[in-house]
Amino acid sequence: MKKGLLREMLAEFLGTFVLIVFGVGVVAQVVLSKHTAGDFLSINIAWGLAVTMGCYVAAGVTGAHLNPAVTLALAVHRKLPWGKVLPYAVSQLAGAFVASAIVFLTYHDAINAFDGGVRQVLGAQGTAGIWATYPQPFLSTFPGGFIDQVVGTALLVGVIFGITDSRNSPAPAGLAPVVVGLLVLLIGATFGFNSGYAINPARDFGPRLFTFVAGWSGEVFRAGHAWWWVPIVAPCIGGVIGGWAYDACVGHRFPSAG
């Protein structure tokens, strides 16, 4: 493996780790405190700040994708070498998995106090939702939940393309991570109700895989009408659509130089 690619993979690993350790951490605090130490607003704010901090960690090396859907969209629309897509995605997944383990270790005693040591996925003592997303009971896996994830990720990637386009009105130098964090906060505050706005395959599957091996059993893949695949597939499609929409409406409409 080339040293340059290894450096990029490590940056994506650490950036995603920072994103997930803070993001999952805030959900753990809210759930385990039974909403006495936070609420849905604090979750949205913390996830937005988590994105910002993760981006600052990795931006100078890779641009801080921290999300396989973003990586895929950049390969499709921005000439990111296809050979980097899988290594980046694996690194992002690994960062999310390790971050999930750290949150589990930190809150282990609180989890046991909450559920009595009996790991449950859903229900009053369910704790798997601290790590991965699960849909509301009324939400269909397809098309409802699928559309939810496509729309959320399309908004994410489309706006990211806008705020990083030098021909447009990009975020001021060094402030792009702040703007992206605000964007994620906004998505959570407007489209978080249906299923928790995963909008990132690594953010959902890495923590879900951790809960599978840490005692929550295969129910983490069966719950929510086998919801697990939706936050993997739909964001990848949504990201490509969002990038296409930006380019079709704005990106390809700028006059050619000269």
Predicted regions and their residues:
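Membrane-interface helix-loop junctions and terminal tails of multi-pass membrane proteins
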Residues: M1-G258
